Swiss-Prot record:
PANTHER family: PROTEIN-GLUTAMATE METHYLESTERASE/PROTEIN-GLUTAMINE GLUTAMINASE, PROTEIN-GLUTAMATE METHYLESTERASE_PROTEIN-GLUTAMINE GLUTAMINASE. Residues 6-124 form the Response regulatory domain. Contains a C-terminal catalytic domain, and an N-terminal region which modulates catalytic activity. GO terms for molecular function: phosphorelay response regulator activity; protein-glutamate methylesterase activity; protein-glutamine glutaminase activity. Involved in chemotaxis. Part of a chemotaxis signal transduction system that modulates chemotaxis in response to various stimuli. Catalyzes the demethylation of specific methylglutamate residues introduced into the chemoreceptors (methyl-accepting chemotaxis proteins or MCP) by CheR. Also mediates the irreversible deamidation of specific glutamine residues to glutamic acid. The active site is at 173, 200, 292. It catalyses: [protein]-L-glutamate 5-O-methyl ester + H2O = L-glutamyl-[protein] + methanol + H(+); L-glutaminyl-[protein] + H2O = L-glutamyl-[protein] + NH4(+). This is Protein-glutamate methylesterase/protein-glutamine glutaminase 2.
Amino acid sequence: MRKKIKVLIVEDSLVVRELLKHIIGSDERFEVMAAVTSAEDCLEMLETQQPDVISLDIRLPGMNGLDATLKIMSRRPTPIVVVAAQVDDNELNIAMNALRAGALSVVEKPVGVTNAGYDTMAAKICTQLAIMSQVQVVRQGINRGLNFGSDDTPARVSQGRPGTYSMVGIVASTGGPQALVQLLGGLGADFPLPILLVQHITSSFLEGFVTWLSGTTPFEARIAQDGEKPVAGKVYVAPVDHHLGLVNDQLVILDLPAVCNQKPSGTVLFGSMARDIGKHGIGVVLTGMGADGSEGLRQMADKGAYTIVEDASTCVVNGMPAAAAKLGAARETLPLPAIAARLRDLALGGEK
């Protein structure tokens, strides 16, 4: 018999706590090790017991979810899935910063069993807990998660012909927000190319994610609008439940079927870049589940674009990068801290 995944639930609301116990306890993969009401209780329990994964509320009495994440990752590193309500910008900001501090993913708080979205939401919570329980987390200094920058980023390796590349496309899923903060921070405010981004994220968190990205990186992040002409200094994020594409150097918002079970899809973005700018594009596949982006990246590579996938050593989940590499779509496979250096080199100097 397969060993069950031990889950520690940290949630102060009695209603939500009981609902999480029901959702997780009804899945035969899990064992609810305990359900506590505060971060302090969680930390005390971790002194003597080790869950496989923690379901962590953000808004708690006393210590909030961000501070709890920092302490957990410095004292007793454990995979953390943040469970957040989409109620206000402050809660979303805390949730996103918890990712920077070492939490692995954010999911939406469950709704009542009679709600139309209950089954989908419950399945997503269980999927995230199961996947994240397998991630090998490491001890982090108390401030490490809030200090992503370019310190670990190698210097540019060469200079060549400016103007070879005109645009960067990025796709990310699980682990993406924290990876993007590190990557974009390493690019610097003088990075000369527009950036188009597909981030798989719960729709109710998208606007908060975009605001958070603007506040934590040198770039202005915004939800892409149909007909916009991308310019340097901005990150154009695919909107909720629509694909993002590029036609005649302008953004297009497409209401087409999902690709690789994703809408928006990185493959749609990359495919449009391959057709529109060919060898002048750069495509990057970051951490994430599934295979989205792999076929589109192959199309970019076939057109002579520069294609990069994140190395497994720095991925939270190595699904999408591995799928792209398996297709032969990756010109380079790089650990996350090296990707920014390579992008700067390409944008400012051409090919290596």
